[in-house]
Amino acid sequence: DGNRETLRILQELVPLELNEYPSGSAIYDWVIPPEWTIRDAYIKNASGDRIVDFNESNLHVVSYSTPVDLQLDFASLRPHLHTIESEGEVIPYRTTYYKRDWGFCVTRSQYEQLERSEGELFIKIDSALNEGGSMTVAECCVPGETSEEYLVSTYFCHPSMANDNLSGLL
């Protein structure tokens, strides 16, 4: 699990206290979703070439995608593809916490390559949703020289997005 591994590494630098909150718990106006784990995901053409590969970018899979192992033509796959038409090599970020679905986020050029593919496409998402899982949260209190307190809140749950994630911790 990438989040827990990140926290383990950060614990080497900062004395973090880790707390677990069970999936399904209501926190104010939010419900903690099931714990999601992904091991691999790809779209291969009929020749066996991986056109889209989770191992090249973890943004390629819609976060919280359900597991799938399918053979589809492009027309059937199209509703599960997300791209930004005006941006050739940009991979969009999508998630589906509360709606059971699956999908891939692809560059425009990958989309066009899939569209040109002849024959069936092989779609695999090796993932799991665990209703009995949990969300790990870290906290740390750094004593200051006055009685004033400041709360700094940050997160890193959206993969590979430096502008709004791990950069906030650093």
Report residues per predicted region:
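N-terminal hydrophobic/helix-forming segments and targeting peptides
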Residues: D1-L170
